């Protein structure tokens, strides 16, 4: 699916989503658990796999790494050692790394053109669990992603859309953006735009009046952005 010079292909394995970024000749696998389908795609499109990497090192995102490395000449890029703002070149086009700790210490996002592969940091209509326990760091990572252009396409690490929209609707039953996304999203090529996320994802709506009223109704701290976001993270 083309979006600028670097194209993106999405693959499923369970509820996980794997990705291939590619130019005219070179490709990069991210969380490549669907390794057989990725190898088939590479062969069909005459692509050379140059890099294998991950959004983070949790086991469900890494099962394809050894298979892809063993069957190609690709280099492994360890997400734990990638630098913030590091540029990985595919046919001369940059894929930019953002370090986004929170879900895990080693979480990174990959930005190519308008496409952002977010792993378990930002999902479609929700965010990841904060397994590090560093809520402040996670909040700063989310704020950083929110500052990107509104037309940025969000490609997440899992398809949690149905449950995420159900929870978002539970918090904001009168929000039409939630149902609109449910009706229009493509389950075979799943993404949202950052503009859509800002309209439906409760964890990006901490400054919006309906969310502030919700926190007030539940008698939760809401004086600052940080307090509102912390309060949202406590709601189940």
What is the role of each PLM region?
Residues 4-45, 108-119:
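Conserved beta-strand hairpin/beta-sheet module of binuclear metal-dependent hydrolase folds
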Residues 32-34, 57, 102-104, 114-115, ...:
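Active-site metal-binding loops of divalent metal-dependent hydrolases
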Residues 50, 120, 152:
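Conserved acidic residues
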């Amino acid at each position: 699916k083309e979006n600028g010079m670097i194209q993106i292909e999405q693959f499923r394995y369970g509820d996980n989503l794997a990705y291939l970024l590619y130019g005219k000749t070179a490709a990069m696998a991210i969380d490549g658990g669907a390794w057989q389908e990725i190898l088939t795609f590479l062969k069909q499109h005459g692509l050379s796999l140059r890099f294998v990497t991950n959004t983070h090192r949790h086991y469900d995102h890494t099962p394809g790494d050894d298979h892809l490395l063993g069957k190609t000449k690709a280099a492994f890029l360890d997400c734990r050692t990638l630098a913030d703002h590091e540029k990985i070149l595919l046919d001369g086009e940059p894929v930019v790394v953002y370090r986004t700790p929170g879900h895990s210490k080693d979480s990174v996002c990959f930005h190519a053109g308008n496409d952002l592969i977010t792993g378990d940091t930002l999902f479609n209509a929700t965010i990841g669990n904060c397994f590090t326990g560093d809520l402040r760091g996670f909040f700063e990572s989310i704020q950083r992603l929110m500052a990107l252009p509104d037309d940025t396409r969000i490609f997440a690490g899992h398809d949690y859309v149905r449950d995420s929209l159900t929870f978002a609707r539970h918090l904001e039953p009168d929000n039409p953006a939630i149902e609109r996304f449910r009706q229009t999203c493509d389950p075979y090529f799943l993404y949202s735009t950052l503009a859509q996320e800002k309209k439906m994802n409760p964890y990006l709506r901490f400054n919006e009046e309906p969310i502030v009223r919700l926190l007030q109704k539940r008698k939760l701290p809401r004086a600052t952005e940080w307090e509102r976001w912390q309060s949202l993270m406590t709601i189940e």
